[in-house]
Every structure is written in structure tokens, then in C-alpha cells.
Amino acid sequence: MDIHQILKLLPHRYPFLLVDRVNELERGKRILAIKNVTINEPFFTGHFPARPVMPGVLILEALAQAAGLLSFDMMGEAPGDDKVFYFVGIDGARFKRPVEPGDQLILDVELDRIKGGIYKFKGVARVGDSVACEAEIMCTMRTVA
């Protein structure tokens, strides 16, 4: 899935779109996506000027956006002004290595279960073979007026 397809499925835009490409998608099960991290990211201006590191919360957001792509694809729907996929919870977040400019963040997200309208995912973000972050992510679809 290229960036044009991603833009149809995610409502996020610059500077908050954190998925550049989907390399694998197993409908309703798993997604493998990437975020190319460059020195031009706006957050590097202040985090940290002498030693730029991608904020952990943005790594989690990238995993959540990949989960959103998996969910919208599974439902065969695109977001609209009346439907939003909200990030509602996180468990067991662990950060194992810094993510720096020039890294390619590999986002590996699996659907664990759906219960009571809450989608639970297991996500791992890697740089090469090294785990940068892992977490369980919860999201839900809401219709808004």
C-alpha cells in the first residue's frame, strides 16, 4: 500500500502522519508498515537538538496508525467526517532502543481480539532486527455528529 492509499484510509496529515508505506497486510490479522525517520521531522528541533531522538509517544502513535490502517482495511471502510478510530488505551509499553534520524521504523501490528467494540492489538516497532518499542494498543471506532 503506497502513500496515496494510506492517505485515503488515515485522517492524519503532516506533521502527524507517521506511516509512509505498508509492505504487508493480512486482512483482519496483521500489518507490516514503515515510517522513514528523517532529520526533517519537526519534533527533532526540540527533542533533542544535540542528540535527536524520536519521542516514544510518537513511536506508539505510529503503531496506532498502523493498527488503524489494519482496522479500516478489515472493515472495508474509509474514515469520514462521521467515523473516527480513537486510540483509547495502552498496556505494557516498553522502549528498548532510541530511534534516530536515518532509521527506518518497521511497524509490526497484529490484531489480538475485538471485545465490546474495543480492538486490541499487539505492536512491535523495530529498527532492523532490534526492537525499539513494544506495546498492547487499544482502539475503538466511534460515530461522531
Swiss-Prot record:
The keyword Lipid metabolism applies. GO terms for molecular function: (3R)-hydroxyacyl-[acyl-carrier-protein] dehydratase activity. It is an enzyme of class 4 (lyase). It catalyses: a (3R)-hydroxyacyl-[ACP] = a (2E)-enoyl-[ACP] + H2O. The gene is fabZ. It holds the Pfam family FabA. Involved in unsaturated fatty acids biosynthesis. Catalyzes the dehydration of short chain beta-hydroxyacyl-ACPs and long chain saturated and unsaturated beta-hydroxyacyl-ACPs. This is 3-hydroxyacyl-[acyl-carrier-protein] dehydratase FabZ. Belongs to the thioester dehydratase family. FabZ subfamily. It comes from Acidovorax sp. (strain JS42). GO terms for cellular component: cytoplasm; membrane. CDD domains: FabZ (cd01288). Keywords: Cytoplasm, Lipid A biosynthesis, Lipid biosynthesis, Lipid metabolism, Lyase. InterPro entries: FabA_FabZ, FabZ, HotDog_dom_sf.
